[in-house]
Every structure is written in structure tokens, then in C-alpha cells.
UniProtKB/Swiss-Prot annotation:
Pfam families: Spt46. GO terms for biological process: cell differentiation; fusion of sperm to egg plasma membrane involved in single fertilization; spermatogenesis. This is Spermatogenesis-associated protein 46. The gene is SPATA46. It is found in: Nucleus membrane. It comes from Macaca fascicularis. Plays a role in spermiogenesis and fertilization. The lineage of its organism: Eukaryota, Metazoa, Chordata, Craniata, Vertebrata. Keywords: Differentiation, Membrane, Nucleus, Spermatogenesis. One of its GO terms (cellular component) is nuclear membrane.
Amino acid sequence: MENFSLLSISGPPISSSALSAFPDIMFSRATSLPDIAKTAVPTEASSPAQALPPQYQSITVRQGIQNTALSPDCSLGDTQHGEKLRRNCTIYRPWFSPYSYFVCADKESHPEAYDFPEVQQDEGKWDNCLSEDMAESICSSSSSAENTCPREATKKSRHGLDSITSQDILMASRWHPAQQNGYKCAACCRMYPTLDFLKSHIKRGFREGFSCKVYYRKLKALWSKEPKAWLGDRLSSGSCQAFNSPAEHLR
């Protein structure tokens, strides 16, 4: 298995006293960014400071490079939230995932609280849209056209589909081979040591780039629409080979 490495976003900031005591630091930082150095020096040379003595010209150029290197465009941000994000967060990318993640040292510097609030909003919108679609599909599958679903029944069915319980997880795993070392997710086939880990994976899978919760919601929708049909198929089938799992209806 490959080794994981954490990449730090930025190094520690340099104080103003250190810059005044060691001016060569800024020149070394400026040489590492040739575009900034090239654009900063000619602008200062073309300014009225060119008529000053050489010792004052060096001070002016030094101040111009300092202002250019510490500008907000060249850093991650000078706000208080940006400083916390730079100091406490790192970038982590697993070998099996095409996505990169922010790993923070504490909850206060979590990127979702500062620069990425749309992640939680999109997750909530996605969950609400899925629950509404499931409720509408259940209502539209009624045998008679006169029977309409009221608002209360729709809300109850929506709440039932949103909550994935331990009983639902165990019921979905009946059509899979028995696992002795843990619990297997019926959607992505990943193994987890305990049932609580599997429940948290299903609940927070959206942040990993996929959502196994959708799979379990569709299973619950099928079970709620025709529970007697699943029970009749199970009793009529004499062996497991003749029994069709509800997962085949989702494909």
C-alpha cells in the first residue's frame, strides 16, 4: 500500500520586525517569484523616486517588493479566518479517490465555516430533492387515480425515507453473503468494523464524493410500496438462487 503524505498549505508568516531586521529575506522571496520581481522593479524605476539618491532608491524598491509580496493577491487572505485556515488546515488526497480534502486541526478552522458554505447548502438541497422525488413516486404509484396523497402523508413518508435506521441496514444486507469480520455497505461494498461506522458512512457519504444514502432510500421506497410482494417472493422461493433481491430492481 502506498504511503500517504500531507501537504501544508503555507508556512508560518514573517513578522514585520523580522523583515526590517533582515531585508535580504524579502529579496530571496522575491527571487523565487520572478514574475512579481520583474513587475515590481520597473514600476518603481519609472516612478518619481528615480531622481532620489541611490540609498533612497534601494529603500523605495525594497518597500515596493514588500508591498507586492504581502498583497492579498499573492496569499490566501489576510483576514482572521484566512489566517486560521492557513495555519491549521492541510490538503489530503487518498490514492483511491480523485478528490482532495481539507484536514483541519480543530473545528473552528474548518473550511466549511469560512470559505465553503455552499457544500452544506448543496447537501441539504440534494437531500430535500431526493426525499421529494421519493414521496412523489410513492404517491404516483397508486392504483386508482382518485386516491391522492395528502400533505400529511407526504411529510410522514418523506421523514421515513430520510432516516436510515439500523434495521434498514440489516434488512438490506440479507441479500448479501454473511460477513464475519464486520458490516458491508450494500451500495459501495465497503467493509466497516461496527454498525455505527456503517451508519455514519451512509449519513456522511456525500462529503466523500458519493452518496450511499440514495441507495438505501430507494430500497426503503421499494419496501414501502410493495412489502407483501417481497414477502410472497421470499416464501414461494425454495432456494436463495430463485430469490431476486430488491437491488436488481434498482439497476
